[in-house]
Amino acid sequence: ISCSCTTGITKSTVEVRRAFGVLFIAVSIAVVIASCFSEIAYFIIGLQLYYYVIIWLASFGAVFGASYRRLRKALPAILNRLKTSTRWPTAAKIFNGICWAGPFAAIAAFPSLYQYLILAGIGLGNLSTYLMIKKYSNTDNPEQLIVALVSLAAVPAAVIIDNMVFATRQDIAIMLSRIFIGIAYAAGGMFALLRKAGPVGFDPTTSGSLQ
């Protein structure tokens, strides 16, 4: 019975991880494509805001449409993990919301820092969600932690590159930051798809028993 339960837990963990791996890879590809097409369109003809909306919606629609079969299979596992947030304490929900929305809301007050605030928003939001799920659901999602850490590490990198290379081209600086976000999700997605999971509580440095 113990062996059967362990196998079930392991299978469930792998399914959820792969589901988020597929989702993160799709997000990564869509972000990079939309960023590049937005910059190309801006350079060639200049763009109004609604053109950006069309490009981004079309990019995500195309990528998610092409990945529909994989995402459809992954959707139940994704929704199941997201449901865990409904059981968090109110304070935890508020904190998580601030981590996600705070940096993006700050763009209105500091538009010149747009490219850094979007990286901070993705980084802090994913980090907060990772910590909350780990604390309240006793689930470790390293792929989400990777997205957070890569995004946050990209902030100083973007500052240095922008000041040294793109000081007079904020449009390119913004595109670079979005590509960093794509890289962050790609890293998390690849980790989720390639990592071999052991059962919950499994420590590979021990004899293999549950802790």
For the regions a language model picked out, list residue spans one by one:
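Juxtamembrane helix-loop boundaries in multi-pass membrane proteins
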Residues: 5, 9-30, 79-98, 141-151
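Membrane-embedded alpha-helical transmembrane segments of multi-pass integral membrane proteins
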Residues: 30, 34, 59, 99-102, ...
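Alpha-helical transmembrane segments of polytopic membrane proteins
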Residues: 22-26, 51-60, 92, 115-122, ...
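Terminal transmembrane helical module of multi-pass membrane proteins
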Residues: 132-202, 211
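Internal transmembrane alpha-helix with an interfacial aromatic "cap," most often the third helix
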Residues: 62-87, 100-109
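Membrane-helix interface and helix-disruption motif detector
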Residues: 39-55, 104-121, 161-177
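Membrane-proximal helix-loop-helix units in multi-pass membrane proteins
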Residues: 86-148
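N-terminal topogenic module of multi-pass integral membrane proteins
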Residues: 1-77
